[in-house]
Regions:
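ABC transporter nucleotide-binding domains
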Residues: 1-226, 236, 300-309
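Short catalytic/signature loops enriched in Gly
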Residues: 122-126, 216-309
Length: 309
């Protein structure tokens, strides 16, 4: 059995955005699919995931299915493959309303048009009758957001929701999510690898590495004072505005193979601060400042940054 996630824990609060960041393959999307109950049947999940006090992992598949779309929803990376090409945009938004709010066909379609207006699709009544291939990438993603928020879910998971969009549309989509979050009080889990997006839109941050949580903090605290060497490396590798002709910083080494992960801290083979004890056991997630947690034996890192061990 291949272990993808190992002892992760986080909390998303109503009306706030929790960003989960990390390199590709670190387990960000797997964690979200586990919450939604969308992992393959042969996946084994242990622990608990609670929504408004209810244990999602203890529910039957039928009970979890009833919650999806009604009380928890997810926006995927690529709207063109997530939307059904055989149905119009309005029909796909209306489907959620008919299923979960028991509206008749006409009432659901009218509500769908109103929802498309809410996500700022111009001429929503006409666009509601168009098929996904007739819409731009930005409009398709807005339709996905309309579907996800149609029933005012308590939790919205946005998995790299702007990856396929240009920078201008990306900013519009993220601003829209912020506005709708404040309006509805929905808790948002934003999965991304873009630290600029995290800085602008997240309230809290979880940094993941190789299936484990490396650091967890308020967004402002994490950017001001990172307390895990991996986070330090991520922030150092982010290109600064106006950089020209300079070599980009990088984190030496490669992500470990989860089929045979290194003992102890999984970042130790790449860490400039690693000591022998780092390979002896998985470091616990420890509070190094109020509300700021790090899974590093050498945290807090005061006085160490910029100096290898």
């Amino acid at each position: 059995m291949l272990g993808i996630l190992d002892g992760i824990s986080f909390r998303a609060e109503a009306g706030k955005t929790l960003a989960i960041v990390g390199e590709s393959g670190c387990g960000k999307s797997v964690a979200s699919l586990a919450i939604m109950g969308l992992l393959p049947e042969n996946a084994e999940v242990s622990g608990s995931a609670r929504l408004m006090g209810r244990d999602l992992l203890g529910m039957s598949a039928e009970e979890r299915r009833a919650l999806r779309g009604a009380e928890m929803a997810m926006i995927f990376q690529e709207p063109m493959t997530s939307l059904n090409p055989a149905f119009t945009a309005g029909e796909q938004v209306a489907e959620a309303l008919r299923l979960h709010q028991r509206l008749d066909r006409d009432a659901a379609f009218k509500a769908a048009i109103a929802m498309l207006e809410k996500v700022r699709i111009p001429d929503a009544a006409r666009r509601a009758r168009q098929y996904p291939h007739q819409l731009s990438g930005g409009m398709r993603q807005r339709v996905m957001i309309a579907i996800a928020l149609a029933c005012r879910p308590k939790l919205l998971i946005a998995d790299e929701p702007t990856t396929a969009l240009d920078v201008t549309v990306q900013a519009q989509i993220l601003a829209l999510l912020d506005d709708l979050k404040r309006e509805t009080g929905t808790a948002v889990i934003l999965i991304t690898h873009d630290l600029g997006v995290v800085a602008d839109h997240a309230d809290d941050v979880v940094v993941m590495y190789a299936g484990r949580v490396a650091e967890q903090a308020r967004a402002a605290d994490l950017f001001a004072r990172p307390e895990h060497p991996y986070t330090v490396g991520l922030l150092g590798a982010a290109p600064a505005a106006g950089m020209r002709g300079e070599r980009l910083a990088s984190i030496e080494g490669t992500v470990p193979d989860l089929r045979a992960p290194p003992p102890g801290c999984r970042f130790a083979p790449r860490c400039p601060f690693a000591i022998a004890r780092c390979a002896e056991g998985a470091p616990p997630l420890t509070e190094v400042a109020p509300g700021h947690f790090s899974a590093c034996l050498r945290a807090p890192l005061d006085g160490m940054l910029g100096v290898a061990a």
